[in-house]
Amino acid sequence: MKRWVVLGIGMWMLGVVLAQTPAAVEKMIDEGKLQAAYSEALKLGNAGYVLAAKAASYYAGYQAADKERGSWYDKAEEAAKKAIQADPDNPEAYFELARAHGRLAQFRGILESLNLASSVRDNLNKALKLNPNHAGAKVALALWHLELTQKGVGWLYGANMGQVVPLFEEAIKLEPQTIIHRVEYATALARMNRKAEAVKQLEFALSLPAKTYADQKDQERAKKQLEELK
């Protein structure tokens, strides 16, 4: 009996150890266990803050109820700031902070949202300075240019509609199999009244294999958008 108890405790401890590695947390995110991934990532300290920010943003975007989305983006912001403090040379940390601020702008007042717009741009530029081939940052920056230009305030921040398509094309060239890039590109094209091109991007996105929970959710979004465009 003691042997089985000891064995059981040993297996439980092994599970705890495995759950508290960056790779294990990343796997949890890929499987859609986002709240658990956030909690486990925080336990990793400096090694887990980027993952905590990612998990929090994903939870807010994919699973959270409307009333709790803002608070989860707050968590993402806090974790991303800690990630930058821990490693100022990590492009992913700046990317996650930009992502959190981009979403938080939807929940904050007008003046604070304007300040966040500058933060999004600056942090994406920092991410790209550290990693010029960061496809996700290119996609986010393309959306930043589109959003501010279409809101009529692009001139205040240096946003330029002419940057939107080139940035998306660069990102897709770097990561042609990434579903979310295609879906976001399609969304931008539709907003620019280039619906035929948007349809092609959505159809391509749906032809790609969904390897993660996020991929599955992004393809669900693609299907819905495709139905609306056709």
Residue ranges and their predicted role:
Residues 24, 52, 57-59, 97, ...:
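Structural register within alpha-helical repeat arrays
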Residues 179-184, 188-191, 199-230:
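Terminal, low-structured helical/coil segments at or just beyond the last alpha-helical repeat
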Residues 58-67, 103-112, 147-156, 191-193, ...:
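Short coil/turn linking the two alpha-helices of tandem helical-hairpin repeats
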